[in-house]
């Protein structure tokens, strides 16, 4: 009886090791492919929120890291993509976090010119409720397009709220928390951009590590 138990235990252990090794091999085999798909998706989004006709540089390669937990909703350094034309700054795209979504963090990216005009906003990742909060995805709703061409200023940032809170933006039926959190993140981030964009364009490029991130 004891030998049978030991034998079965060894078989189970061996099976578990084989399964673990198989999962590790699959993860390793697909890691580069997933990273490449993510890079291509980011490139596609950058083309949407910072139009090619306003810049002539490689936007994806013109990246710096910045850090401000209060403005960006996270302690991690976040990428900023700097757009220029004839070596003159024209616009940027910045990733940011809305930490107070209904189901946690919402990661988004904002394209904005140097005068504060929003060129586009897109949702990168989220866990909001399907059919309600997921209207922050462009494929589910045109809501994110309501940011297009709006000019942000510190004096008028009280308008960057949902209508229920006295602002200019629609909320979602049955889901006010998600758009409210989204708008707070956009507003905080644009204030941060306005205060720092001139300095960012004078920074050395590099997003491979946190060495160039703001402290």
Swiss-Prot record:
It is a single-pass membrane protein. Its main location: membrane. Keywords: Cell inner membrane, Cell membrane, Electron transport, Flavoprotein, FMN, Membrane, Phosphoprotein, Translocase, Transmembrane, Transmembrane helix, Transport. It is an enzyme of class 7 (translocase). It is found in: Cell inner membrane. The chain crosses the membrane at residues 9-29. GO terms for biological process: electron transport chain. GO terms for cellular component: plasma membrane. It comes from the Bacteria. The modification FMN phosphoryl threonine is found at residue 176. One of its GO terms (molecular function) is FMN binding. It holds the Pfam family FMN_bind. Its cofactor is FMN. The keyword Cell membrane applies. Its EC number is 7.-.-.-. InterPro entries: FMN-bd, Ion_transpt_RnfG/RsxG. The complex is composed of six subunits: RnfA, RnfB, RnfC, RnfD, RnfE and RnfG. Part of a membrane-bound complex that couples electron transfer with translocation of ions across the membrane. Belongs to the RnfG family. This is Ion-translocating oxidoreductase complex subunit G. It comes from Shewanella amazonensis (strain ATCC BAA-1098 / SB2B).
